[in-house]
Amino acid sequence: MPILLAVNLAHSRLPVLSSVLVAGVLLLGLPAASAAQGVAGTVPEETIRSQVPAPSVRAAAAIVYNTETGDVLWESNSGAQRSIASITKLMTAVVFMEESPDLSAVVTITREDVRRASTTYLRAGFKVTKGDLLHLTLIASDNAAARTLARVSDHGSEAFVARMNSKAEELGLTITRYADPSGLSNDNVSSALDMAKLLTYVSGDVRLTDVMQKQSYSVPVVGRRAPILIRSTNQLVRNGDVDVVAGKTGFIRSAGYCLATLLRLPQGGPPVAVVVLGATSNAGRFREVRSLFDWFAKAAPDLLGHAVVPFGAD
């Protein structure tokens, strides 16, 4: 007689292929791995676990997500709601670009834009283009730039945040709530799973991915002789030894160190989203994302059903 097995994996640190429930039918006398074969589009959990041990991750929440199929390949507390700090700026950029703005239009920075901005290269009175504000927002995580994008949008700052929340709802980001465009508010919250889904959406806009792949950028300021030179806050981009399709860092005390990335194997194929929230240090977030990506590279033949050379192999 078949037995229906439903396992809640929402807080598991083992490789999984569903963010909430995996259902399988176990026939008497058959091992769990055999029954798992009956779940369409999945891989036997036991096979993955025994062949490629999952890495140890200290971040409060993390996920490895297949952007092509929507499968959760590995997770730890990926559905937990947490403060996301400047990862908020991903949605800021999405909503701003959906207005099809004139990126060459020049904007004057106001005192309110830079007030208590914490991290900014801008000063009141600076004149920069909307396109350069986008670069400052995504590359340097400039809070004043993100605020300015919202202010100069079609409907102003307050309506902009409302549109960020509407877009989150449209994309099915059920855990996500936005309170401001910069990420400085503790009330910008989401989950690792929701951010993986948002990265998947972002991957379809080359205007955004092209910006996030830049290691550095020069921002001209109208009437100022020297440009502003900025570097990516994403160490994986700066190092250049892994193919980063898109990514955003974030940190405030309530969020811890956060990193949402879209990475591609050297052999190509669809990118995988790797997100860590609440890492214990700046270096730790990059180390743990890289550890999870290296695990994915080794586990990919099982997870994706084709041969892949482990990342970094000779």
Predicted regions and their residues:
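Active-site-adjacent loops and short helices of periplasmic peptidoglycan-processing enzymes
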Residues: A36-L193, K197-V206
